[in-house]
Amino acid sequence: MKSRAAVAFAPGKPLEIVEIDVAPPKKGEVLIKVTHTGVCHTDAFTLSGDDPEGVFPVVLGHEGAGVVVEVGEGVTSVKPGDHVIPLYTAECGECEFCRSGKTNLCVAVRETQGKGLMPDGTTRFSYNGQPLYHYMGCSTFSEYTVVAEVSLAKINPEANHEHVCLLGCGVTTGIGAVHNTAKVQPGDSVAVFGLGAIGLAVVQGARQAKAGRIIAIDTNPKKFDLARRFGATDCINPNDYDKPIKDVLLDINKWGIDHTFECIGNVNVMRAALESAHRGWGQSVIIGVAGSGQEISTRPFQLVTGRVWKGSAFGGVKGRSQLPGMVEDAMKGDIDLEPFVTHTMSLDEINDAFDLMHEGKSIRTVIRY
């Protein structure tokens, strides 16, 4: 079938809006009509060429919502007409990782997904007869996309796709990191480095967890009003100080902050976040994705004296079994999604959405098909 899509033909170049061909779903696959998709920093990261798994030409997009159109052989968990959110972190329930109960990092489709392919090692997209790669198992920058059954969460059909599409990545990542990775407790202190969608979601999650002091940190003070709306008690612009941000936080508590979250992808900030964590028990959670080949460093003394460095992917949330519940929470108002959507656009305007992101003028732009 034909589908309008925003295709990245080469790194560092604007997306091109073209009509592509989408093949029917094969065994264990599902064809969906995407209704809405967020434009995320991870899409921009891959488009920049810094992503070690980036392949081109590719249909980007991984933060979407849509409706099932057709199912392939053997698919039983969804049917045409079901409302779904594609998952870049699958949940098969059968691999070693799923069976362990210790992680959300299912590996059922990981090997092929990292190569931009469907589980059978081929692609369902083409343009003028030439194959196009998939992206993170989702490719929501196409009006129609094919996704593995294990990479779909079935959601309440009454949910507002313009809002709940954000649960496909950023908001779930931030809120989940608070509850699942850090396990923030009432009264704990929290510092959040970077106030994009993920960082703001961490702030909201910290408020849900009844954290005491919630410190929001960003060099763009225009984000502070929204941070306060989500629950920040303090907002700090590092540029307002003539000393490192670590020292600013240690002035607040000389022993450090109970939980720090790095939501940028800057290895220097990752170190600052760790070294701002509380002596004896502080945790620092890395959420931001650093560039290819970059490494983190600190003195071992920081860990010997009780600090813990952790990472979090998709907030530790298991997509098929747990994400539908988060959609219900959003519908009840327990998760506030509307403020994240600062702009809505058509697919034809998608390059403008990337510009707004790079200029720091948006939190999330949602593309409506």
From Swiss-Prot:
Where in the cell? Cytoplasm
* Keywords for this protein: Cytoplasm, Metal-binding, NAD, Oxidoreductase, Zinc
**CDD domains registered for this protein in UniProt:** alcohol_DH_class_III (cd08300)
The family database entries (InterPro entries) matched by this protein are listed as: ADH-like_C, ADH-like_N, ADH_3, ADH_Zn_CS, GroES-like_sf, NAD(P)-bd_dom_sf, PKS_ER
Annotated GO MF terms? alcohol dehydrogenase (NAD+) activity; S-(hydroxymethyl)glutathione dehydrogenase (NAD+) activity; S-(hydroxymethyl)glutathione dehydrogenase (NADP+) activity; S-nitrosoglutathione reductase (NADH) activity; zinc ion binding
Which SMART domains does its entry note? Answer: PKS_ER (SM00829)
Q: Main location per UniProt?
A: cytoplasm
Q: Which PROSITE patterns match?
A: ADH_ZINC
Q: Name one GO biological process term.
A: formaldehyde catabolic process
Q: How is the cofactor bound?
A: Binds 2 Zn(2+) ions per subunit.
**Cofactor needs:** Zn(2+)
Q: Known EC number(s)? A: 1.1.1.284, 1.1.1.1, 1.1.1.-
Question: Gene Ontology terms, cellular component aspect?
Answer: cytosol
Gene3D superfamilies referenced in this protein's UniProt entry, alphabetically: Medium-chain alcohol dehydrogenases, catalytic domain, NAD(P)-binding Rossmann-like Domain
Q: State whether keyword Oxidoreductase applies.
A: yes
Query: Which residues are Zn(2+) 2-binding?
Result: C92, C95, C98, C106
* Reactions listed under catalytic activity: S-(hydroxymethyl)glutathione + NADP(+) = S-formylglutathione + NADPH + H(+); S-(hydroxymethyl)glutathione + NAD(+) = S-formylglutathione + NADH + H(+); a primary alcohol + NAD(+) = an aldehyde + NADH + H(+); a secondary alcohol + NAD(+) = a ketone + NADH + H(+)
Would you say which domain of life the source belongs to? Bacteria
Secretion signal span: none
Q: Which residues bind Zn(2+) 1?
A: C40, H62, C169
Its biological purpose: Has high formaldehyde dehydrogenase activity in the presence of glutathione and catalyzes the oxidation of normal alcohols in a reaction that is not GSH-dependent. In addition, hemithiolacetals other than those formed from GSH, including omega-thiol fatty acids, also are substrates. Also acts as a S-nitroso-glutathione reductase by catalyzing the NADH-dependent reduction of S-nitrosoglutathione.
Q: Which NCBIfam families match?
A: adh_III_F_hyde
- Family listed: Belongs to the zinc-containing alcohol dehydrogenase family. Class-III subfamily.
Q: What is this protein called?
A: S-(hydroxymethyl)glutathione dehydrogenase
Organism, scientific name: Escherichia coli O139:H28 (strain E24377A / ETEC)
